[in-house]
Amino acid sequence: LREEGQRIRSLPGVDQCVVLSTCNRMEIYYWSNEPENAQEHILSHFLGDGRGELDMASYFYSHQGEDALGHLCRVLSGLDSMVLGETEIFGQVKTAYHTALDAGITAACANKTFQKAFTIGKKVRTESQIHAGATSVGSVAVELAEQIFGDLSGTRVLILGAGEMSRVTGRALHARGAEGIYVANRSFDRAVELA
């Protein structure tokens, strides 16, 4: 993410940026005195100049000003997740922000925005019950498996992939008594590490 953030920061019109990339989202938070120009360069960076027959730009969304801050706060609080209140996203945003900070591609505006959003996200999580119950895609998947297959104690399970969601799912399966947890991944070393 550091290198991608530096590439985006070097695009015309982009003054500061933070790149958030998870298994479920890719978001670019950027600051610019020329937002339309910067957005066009960011889209071209990802899509190329020849966008072809399919208008890929229609699959992107954009927020500006207070709407962008509101979106970031919804992301941090788990309101904009596949599983309402999921907890992993807060740490993922924090990592993305610190990566950008360490790379020197943020400044006062980005720093102030993210600090304010972290405060709001924490407040929403601590003052509401949004985090009650299953709060990750992995834990919801395990609950669904229990509804379909019954007790998971002693079962053998194959997890596809070795990313963070697979790690969370593996922990949830182990906690429910699954004994044979196998991992299939394109990288053998990462699969072994997770197993």
Q: Model-found features: residue ranges?
A:
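Glycine-rich phosphate/diphosphate-binding loop of Rossmann-like nucleotide-binding domains
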Residues: 142, 146-195
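Glycine/serine-rich phosphate-binding loop and adjoining beta1-alpha1 elements at the start
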Residues: 54-153
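Solvent-exposed alpha-helical segments within well-ordered globular domains of core cellular machineries
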Residues: 6, 44, 70, 91, ...
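Long, contiguous hydrophobic alpha-helical segments, chiefly transmembrane helices and signal peptides
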Residues: 1, 26-29, 85, 120, ...
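A glycine-rich (often HGG/GG-containing) alpha/beta subdomain
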Residues: 1-81
